[in-house]
């Protein structure tokens, strides 16, 4: 338990949040987030390309559900207006920080501005950014120099590569989740060796400016090499580099 609290406190400090709560995986974190916080009188507005764990977590809660076309701020505002018109008590906007299939970044500054305008909360799954995006690897909000209300993330990628997930946010939210998030209450805690590895990985991340620079140099080199060979890529700088093949059978053949 001491190791777990040490890692939770370290994650909260690293991410600039009040506190954090650990889960066995980020799938569990996203699955346990929405139901304790949002009821039938509330609304959740989700990006159309959000990760499956966010989609499943939203399905488990009783809030009214709205969806906006991915990164379409005009459509997001339309859904915010609809939620307001439908009498939503509380509204939460949920998005990936980086979309896992194409490496594009959510428009967090614009999302935050709309959230402030309509009195909505913001939730960001930053699994594909924490550890290497933004100053000191603090993720997509830090990359954009903005803030969000709730962050979820994983220990299974840049923060160690084994397993584990977390939710970081305001103290009242984390306190409530400790009492009501079912994947936290009714599942196993992280093994102590994984927790200790997460603490060590976080220290490496905080001191990893040289490694982060090398990662983006490698990604740029790989993008150039693929482009020079005639492959079609989506624009971007993120280490997720989608190759657009345009045909299902060709994609299966390439995967082999």
What are the language-model segments listed below?
Residues 1-5, 182-187:
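A glycine-/small-polar-enriched, mobile loop at the entrance of the PLP active site in fold-type I
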Residues 8-32:
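Short loop-beta-helix segment that forms the pyridoxal 5′-phosphate
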Residues 33-52:
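Conserved PLP-anchoring active-site segment centered on the Schiff-base-forming lysine
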Residues 66, 70-124:
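Active-site phosphate-binding strand-loop segment of PLP-dependent enzymes
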Residues 136, 142-176:
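Active-site PLP attachment segment
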Residues 193-213, 224-229:
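Amphipathic alpha-helix from the class-I
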Residues 213-222, 228-256:
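Conserved PLP-binding catalytic core of the aspartate aminotransferase-like
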């Amino acid at each position: 338990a001491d190791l777990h609290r040490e890692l939770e406190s370290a994650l909260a400090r690293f991410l600039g949040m009040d506190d954090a709560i650990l889960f066995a995986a980020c799938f569990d974190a996203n699955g346990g987030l929405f139901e304790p916080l949002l009821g039938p009188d509330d609304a959740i507005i989700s990006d159309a390309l959000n990760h499956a764990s966010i989609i499943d977590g939203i399905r488990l809660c009783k809030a009214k559900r709205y969806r906006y076309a991915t990164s379409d701020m005009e459509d997001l505002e339309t859904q915010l207006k609809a939620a307001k018109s439908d009498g939503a008590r509380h509204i939460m906007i949920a998005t990936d920080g980086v979309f896992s299939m194409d490496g594009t970044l959510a428009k967090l500054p614009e999302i935050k501005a709309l959230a402030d305008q309509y009195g909505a909360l913001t939730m960001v799954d930053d699994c594909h950014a924490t550890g290497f995006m933004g100053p000191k690897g603090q993720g997509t909000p830090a990359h954009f120099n903005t803030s969000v209300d709730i962050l979820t993330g994983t220990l299974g990628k840049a923060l160690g590569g084994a397993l584990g997930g977390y939710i970081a946010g305001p103290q009242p939210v984390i306190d409530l989740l400790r009492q009501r998030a079912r994947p936290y209450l009714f599942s196993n805690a992280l093994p102590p060796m994984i927790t200790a590895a997460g603490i060590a990985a976080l220290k490496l991340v905080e001191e990893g400016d040289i490694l982060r620079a090398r990662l983006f140099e490698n990604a740029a080199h790989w993008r150039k090499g693929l482009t020079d060979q005639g492959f079609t890529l989506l624009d971007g700088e993120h280490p997720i580099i989608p190759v657009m093949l345009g045909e299902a059978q060709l994609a299966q053949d390439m995967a082999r």
